[in-house]
Amino acid sequence: MFLAQEIIRKKRDGHALSDDEIRFFINGIRDNTISEGQIAALAMTIFFHDMTMPERVSLTMAMRDSGTVLDWKSLHLNGPIVDKHSTGGVGDVTSLMLGPMVAACGGYIPMISGRGLGHTGGTLDKLESIPGFDIFPDDNRFREIIKDVGVAIIGQTSSLAPADKRFYATRDITATVDSIPLITASILAKKLAEGLDALVMDVKVGSGAFMPTYELSEALAEAIVGVANGARVRTTALLTDMNQVLASSAGNAVEVREAVQFLTGEYRNPRLFDVTMALCVEMLISGKLAKDDAEARAKLQAVLDNGKAAEVFGRMVAAQKGPTDFVENYAKYLPTAMLTKAVYADTEGFVSEMDTRALGMAVVAMGGGRRQASDTIDYSVGFTDMARLGDQVDGQRPLAVIHAKDENSWQEAAKAVKAAIKLADKAPESTPTVYRRISE
């Protein structure tokens, strides 16, 4: 039997906590026997004193075990259970292509996703722009879809890592969100509850990233890889660029449209293609579906070329109560904005810099994201045809096409786009899409 205040005191004084102490505290968070004040105190001591790797693994596992951990053995699946998690960005629609692509190559992807957070778009919000799409199928239906289709993308249920929800809510109001051990445990508790064989992390770097500097993004990626492998889930991480909008679009319906176009081959943004392929390659290799980069890329390109990945996406949409002919007729089903009009720069020049975070917030301001949990989303608004770093813009080439609900909203968005995109006399040097791969 432990006392919560003694565990807090031990950590306050700079000592490492045992696995039993951490489990006692996390179970108390779940059972409401630990007060909010005690959660806040422990969070602050961890913020200042950090945690050792064994402590980080124990915290993550205790949070994972605070609820249901999915077990797939009874389904006798003939492939690995794999997933991807992104720290979030703008125009980051990779999940919608990656899940079907990896499933078409023999993997099983039980993806539990989130809503938009701050300036970043949420996969669930994007999918809900598809009429009828059910992000909360019951457990049996979720398992059926995974077995039959190979991929399902759903929302987090209250049974998965419930201690994390309460812990995070307290961190959010006590300035302890940005602690690497706590971020790591929060991300991985939910992902490891999926019962994975392998995981790839997409950790963003740049003006639209969750972490403010390259060094902090790198530290988070290294922490996640270390903890997940310590929890015996094969995990790698890629540091990918978020100094500009990743896709050509940013919003909800507009990104779903681009995802379908990507899968069918109608249009593939080169940077989005690079990042999506790189993440899929990691999943195939970690899941032992390919022996090396070359074999993985060949398999992935094949399922894009032969239409199998697009077919899997269509089957997933239908299985989750969306239209059965969505891939063929996406334009008919996705909502469109009242006003669609291009915004142009005031002067000619080359796009030299982009405040990606500000562009994400501009989508939120138009109604494409939430300022508070109770807000309803306008799925139709957003940006398409986004200019990229190095593009020459003038009276012919716009900075973006804005999809807005009315003229006022369009004017505000146009102002935000012009302020967020800097021009120069010459094009900047190109930056990589993937900066670094981190493995155990």
Swiss-Prot record:
Role description: The enzymes which catalyze the reversible phosphorolysis of pyrimidine nucleosides are involved in the degradation of these compounds and in their utilization as carbon and energy sources, or in the rescue of pyrimidine bases for nucleotide synthesis.
Subunit note: Homodimer.
Name used for this protein in its record: Thymidine phosphorylase
Enzyme Commission code(s) on record: 2.4.2.4
Lineage, broadest ranks: Bacteria, Pseudomonadati, Pseudomonadota, Gammaproteobacteria, Enterobacterales
Keyword terms, alphabetized: Glycosyltransferase, Transferase
NCBIfam families: PRK05820.1, T_phosphoryl, Y_phosphoryl
GO BP terms: pyrimidine nucleobase metabolic process; thymidine metabolic process
CC annotations in GO: cytosol
SMART domains reported for this sequence: PYNP_C (SM00941)
Gene Ontology MF: a single term: thymidine phosphorylase activity
Catalytic activity: thymidine + phosphate = 2-deoxy-alpha-D-ribose 1-phosphate + thymine
Enzyme class name: transferase
Pathway participation: Pyrimidine metabolism; dTMP biosynthesis via salvage pathway; dTMP from thymine: step 1/2
Family per record: Belongs to the thymidine/pyrimidine-nucleoside phosphorylase family.
Annotated SUPFAM superfamilies: Nucleoside phosphorylase/phosphoribosyltransferase catalytic domain, Nucleoside phosphorylase/phosphoribosyltransferase N-terminal domain, Pyrimidine nucleoside phosphorylase C-terminal domain
